Amino acid sequence: MASISDDGMALSGYLKKLKTMKKKFFVLYEETSTSAARLEYYDTEKKFLQRAEPKRVIYLKNCFNINRRLDTKHRFVIVLSSRDGGFGIVLENENDLRKWLDKLLVLQRNIANSNGTAHSPYDHVWQVVIQKKGISEKVGITGTYHCCLTSKSLTFVCIGPEKTPNGEDRVASIEILLTTIRRCGHASPQCIFYVELGRQSVLGSGDLWMETDNAAIATNMHNTILSAMSAKTESNTNLINVYQNRPDLSHEPMRKRSSSANEASKPINVNVIQNSQNSLELRSCSSPHNYGFGRERCDSLPTRNGTLSESSNQTYFGSNHGLRSNTISGIRPHSTNKHSNSPTFTMPLRCSESEESSISVDESDDNGSFSHYRLNTRSSETAIPEENIDDFASAELFSKVTEQNVSDENYIPMNPVNPTDAIHEKEKADMQRLEDASLHFNFPEHASEKLAKDFDLDSDNQCCRPIRAYSIGNKVEHLKFNKRLGHLNDTGQNPNRVRAYSVGSKSKIPRCDLQRVVLVEDNKHEFTANRSQSSITKEGTSYGSSANRQKKSTSAPLLSLKNQINSDRMSDLMEIDFSQATNLEKQKFIKNNEIPKYIENVFPKAPRTDSSSLTLHATSQKDIFNGTKLNNTAITSEDGYLEMKPVGNGYTPSSNCLPMKVEKLKLSDYQTAPPLTATAAPVHDLNKISTYNISAEKWREQPSRSEEKKSNSPLNDNTFSSKPTNVESTSKSHDVHSANQIDCEKVCAQSSDKLNNHLADKIVENNNLDIGGHEEKKLVHSISSEDYTQIKDKSNDFTKFNEAGYKILQIKSDSSLISSKLYQKGIHKDNLERSQRLTESVNTIPDNATATAVSSSSLTKFNINSAKPAAAADSRSTGTDPSTPQNILQIKDLNFPSRSSSRISQPELHYASLDLPHCSGQNPAKYLKRGSRESPPVSACPEDGNTYAKIDFDQSDSSSSSSNIFNT
């Protein structure tokens, strides 16, 4: 190696050329007063010493980049890139590489410093030949170029003359941002590398196809450029960064990779970076090495506002300068500097998006105006400042503004300044109190916490952030749903807004739950039973059926036991409850079809209605419910609500009755009956009365009797030849019966034993009728065996008034049900079982023949409390001589709920029962029978005060677990 001479020689030695791999003698000269820094090579060292002309001279000032090349099969290669082309040197080892490369870079840097230009070396430089394909010929970029890569851009530098042999101009140098590259690739066999540009690139949208020296170079270009595009996309990808002192390239934000046009709808993640520099350097686009761009991706669609090519000489500047620019730095300091020349309030950066693209490079608007931020033109929704915390400087910084800053910087303070005077402090406190007092809204459903909680009254930065305005009652509730459930029924104590409920639904208790809590406190167990299948039929046509249910609700108004109801049931539903109010004073409603005379005596203040004298044509179900217009529907209770339950010619007495008077109306062991009359009536108008509870074994024992009964039954001709003795009729007027009520009681007491014996025979006769006799044809009843045990213990004394049991009135639907033949078999057993199940009553309906007189209807009742097995259930029945026909309405066409009949020839019994819950809280405990909270019964006939019957239009009872269907 030659030593450094006086002419400025720095290094010399034998090296290899990259293209030919031949050894040449290279000499590196420094810049002197007479010559420039250069690199020369000779064929041999001898020619160098002989001062022969060098084979080639490369001036370092013409080299825009000197770096190490790694894409060749040689490990130690240094490339000098210039407008004349690239020149590669292959060294022997790493030490020689470092020595020569460092010296070359020092000389290049010295040249740049002497010329006052910035030196920004490229990371990678490839020499390619751009083909006349795609947009290359259109934009004039063809021929040999240097493809130079940085972390931000891809620059093409022309090699050779700027004119083609055809005289066409060539682009000398052009820089393409990596964010405007949609994709890139290579074709190995053909040594082709291509890039697809987006519409925001300086060349516009299109493809650039370039040829490399070999396939390895094309592959290396693809991998290197793709990795540069993929680097650092997660941070600061769509902001353009300009640095005062160029930092390490690895720390500059970069997009991940390019995206195709069909991904234009992807969201943009804009992040603001922090930098220690407080001022920004003015950069010019004329030098392609002193700035960099970063964005997340390129989306190229048909329309655009402009391109960088239209303003290639734009100036990129920071906030210290007022020149026009299409971009600004992403630097936004989070702390306000006292010595800053800009206002204390830093505006957030904005992103400008084209009409059909998710993001685009900032472009000049050609009007000389400058915006601190980019505007989103696509979105129809404006940004909410208070929701973007990062877009605002800290509020504490605004309170740091002092008078010194105002005087030094000649800015009028636009931020709230702390008053230092004590008077100002006092005035401020008074104003705060006035504002606080004005925020008190007297709305019953609005929380009184006011909106003052949104204010920070102790701080001085109330003006830095706009206060969100809430409408009344619309503030966000922070309480959980389960916490709100504890205050469903306590609106006054709940500070939050509560749901509006309709009348009677605030308890949020399902109606079915209300009906299941009617048991006494000492009888806590639930009565669950399967309801027998029943249907409402008319002339053989089925109108509906119900499946087995274990829980149901009844139509009677019941008290709400809140401690037994789950509070979260139906909490989101609105329920309209037509049941009575929970006030015990207003729960005493008695529904009845006919109002007897003695009811008026008990309730003298109750108004009489004309509906008591009306009749119902028992021809269909519609006639029963809708046959007459109910005049008593206009009568409302004291709580102002109209009774919505289906009633007949109902009667609603006054609610201010005494418990003792109501107790007299209970089904008890009445000893009185209306006087027996001999008034004749058509036989087809008689009510056939029978008990039930003939077991399946009893039905099987008498098939021949049932067939005989079936053949002799006058069902087809609607007549019956038997002489009923278990019913009574009267033709006396309503006034006669009310005056002679005491005489009726005496007559009934004398004929009690005779009627019981005769009635027991008729009951057994009717019980022996065969209607199918299936065990599943049982209707559960509402009284338990325990209740009947208590009733039976008190039923031995038939003369006592207050120790009566429950009376059952049974309605038959056909005249053929009563047979002249009596079956005495199983009387004691059947009546004993029947007396344990019969607890409710049904209503008899008067005939039109007796509609002229209010008291022309007749009643019958049966006592199931007798201790005698044969006549236990019928000891208090009233009756007449067998020769006395009864004038009672025939109701075989009534569509009461009943089970389906197994035989067509035999009619069904349509049984209706009424579950009378305990509606009055004033009844003493001594008048209540254990296990049964039923209101006092009311007689169904205006003349007879000894019996009663009511109709419940609900088809089943959840608590009736011990009764069967009437088999008539």
UniProtKB/Swiss-Prot annotation:
Pfam family, one: IRS
Effect of residue 165 to T: In strain: FSP2, FSP15, FSP16, FSP19, FSP23, FSP29, RR8, RR11, RR17, RR18, RR35, RR52, S76, SL5_131, SL5_29, T28 and T39
Result, substituting residue 675 to S: In strain: S103
GO biological process: cellular response to starvation; determination of adult lifespan; germ-line stem-cell niche homeostasis; glucose homeostasis; growth of a germarium-derived egg chamber; insulin receptor signaling pathway; insulin-like growth factor receptor signaling pathway; lipid homeostasis
Compositional bias of kind Polar residues: 304-329, 529-555, 712-730
Occurrences of domain PH (ranges): 8-109
Positions where Phosphoserine occurs in the chain: 286-287, 342, 555, 932, 935
Keyword terms, alphabetized: Differentiation, Growth regulation, Oogenesis, Phosphoprotein, Repeat
Motif placement: YXXM motif 1: 411-414
Record's keyword annotation contains Repeat: yes
Recorded consequence of changing residue 851 to V: In strain: FSP19
Listed Basic and acidic residues bias regions: 697-711
Effect of residue 29 to C: In strain: S108
Phenotype upon changing residue 452 to T: In strain: RR33, S108, T28 and T39
Role according to the record: Activates phosphatidylinositol 3-kinase when bound to the regulatory p85 subunit. May mediate the control of various cellular processes by insulin-like peptides. When phosphorylated by the insulin receptor binds specifically to various cellular proteins containing SH2 domains. Involved in control of cell proliferation, cell size, and body and organ growth throughout development. Also has a role in a signaling pathway controlling the physiological response required to endure periods of low nutrient conditions.
Other comment: 'Chico' means 'small boy' in Spanish.
Complex and partners: Bindings to phosphatidylinositol 3-kinase and SHP2.
Record's protein name: Insulin receptor substrate 1
Classification of source organism: Eukaryota, Metazoa, Ecdysozoa, Arthropoda, Hexapoda
The encoding gene: chico
